[in-house]
Curated annotation (Swiss-Prot):
The gene is atp9. GO terms for cellular component: mitochondrial membrane; proton-transporting ATP synthase complex; proton-transporting two-sector ATPase complex, proton-transporting domain. It comes from Emericella nidulans (strain FGSC A4 / ATCC 38163 / CBS 112.46 / NRRL 194 / M139). Residues 1-62 form a transit peptide. The chain crosses the membrane at residues 85-105, 119-139. This is ATP synthase subunit 9, mitochondrial. It holds the Pfam family ATP-synt_C. Gene3D superfamilies: F1F0 ATP synthase subunit C (1.20.20.10). Keywords: CF(0), Hydrogen ion transport, Ion transport, Lipid-binding, Membrane, Mitochondrion, Transit peptide, Transmembrane, Transmembrane helix, Transport.
Length: 143
């Protein structure tokens, strides 16, 4: 097992040494083969087409990808912040529901049970709106 590890390392190092020589030989063979004037023109045509395509694309898009990515991040953060403001509204709504419960029970203590069930129902509605708002805020940021 150890002998195969040593052999594999030596083989890899000799291949690493031999690679540049093989590349140089391949380059000289390809340059010798494509020495005719027709071949050089043929090689230049795709590069001209690619250059004109790049220029057309650059003329169409006047911003860099870094700026576009930064603007997407800023809009996500603004959307999340705007949606998170609604969570404050949910907190205020819960406070109003239980404040009204205290006021109603102080005026008519006999209806305490019925008023408390209505208050729990109002709390559930306000909490559902708050959770929906939190879900929208997370979707603005991460989707």
């Amino acid at each position: 097992m150890a002998a195969s590890r040593v052999f594999a390392q030596r083989l890899a190092s000799t291949m690493k040494v031999a690679r540049p020589a093989a590349r140089i030989q391949a380059r000289t063979l390809t340059t010798q083969r494509m020495a005719t004037p027709f071949q050089t023109i043929k090689r230049q045509q795709p590069s001209m087409i690619q250059a004109s395509a790049r220029q057309a694309f650059a003329a169409r898009r006047q911003y860099s990808s870094e700026i576009a990515d930064a603007m997407v991040q800023v809009s996500q953060n603004i959307g999340m912040g705007s949606a998170a403001i609604g969570l404050g509204g949910a907190g205020i709504g819960i406070g109003v529901v239980f404040g009204s419960l205290l006021l109603a029970v102080s005026r008519n203590p006999a209806l305490r049970g019925q008023l408390f069930s209505y208050a729990i129902l109002g709390f559930a509605f306000v909490e559902a709106i708050g959770l929906f708002d939190l879900m929208v805020a997370m979707m603005c940021k991460y989707v």
